Amino acid sequence: MAHATAPERVPLRHVAAQPVFARLRELRGSDELALQGVDTRSAVQLLDRLLAPPLDARTLAPSPPWGEGWGEGRPRQCAAADLSASDRDALLAALHRATWGDRITSSIRCPACEQMVDLSFELSALQRQLQPPPATVHVEGLRALRSAQGESFALPDAQAEEEAATLGLHAGLARLQASITGADSPDGAQLGTTLEALAPLLDVELDAACAECGASQLVRFDIQSFTLQRLLDERERVLGEVHALASGYGWSLDEIVSLPRSLRRALAARLTAAPPAFG
């Protein structure tokens, strides 16, 4: 089912002291086929393709940068790699809503009775639940935060996250913790709790109870891997739609993959439903 709507205005909470918003354009086949994985680099590359420039109020033409409200209302260039993981997660949640809707549905197997357990929730409700009160955090610049207690934190960008990942779990985590606090040996547990409150990620453990036997289990939900994997799982369908439109209309590959996803799907569905011609 298509979910093409007006682009959502997504608040970026760790960019500047004043409100900054971004919009994502609709997916195209070229975006879907370019996706190679579910890691941070793949997420950054996809978001950079989708970040739509704001409209200039005077000319109604797109201005080159996409960040709205940065620098007293003057947009300024920023790449997805510059954003905090929390802000990237907000964009990926908006992408999921635009593509499939706000509700997340999944099924997992109960380890106790082997029956399937349905998991369903709304992304927007989860985001509201995780979002800290405004007075809790003060944004002093790009990824620069100060808590209500006066503690300063420098959130990592995508490159820092990728570099830490190459060091292994413990060394990489220590590297990130030191860069965030500026201290050589920060209290990792306390830092984790603080960051969950100041810059929450859509990477959580949810309680799933089995309707058959009542057993409970914790299920991890990560918006990045969930959304990107869902796109990867649809690759064969995208290729089928491309083939159908190329065969039915004689269009080139470039023409087809440049179509908005909702239009491509609607045209492919019409072609599939059309009765065979006589002759």
Show which residues each predicted segment covers.
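Glycine-biased, low-complexity coil/linker segments
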Residues: 67-68
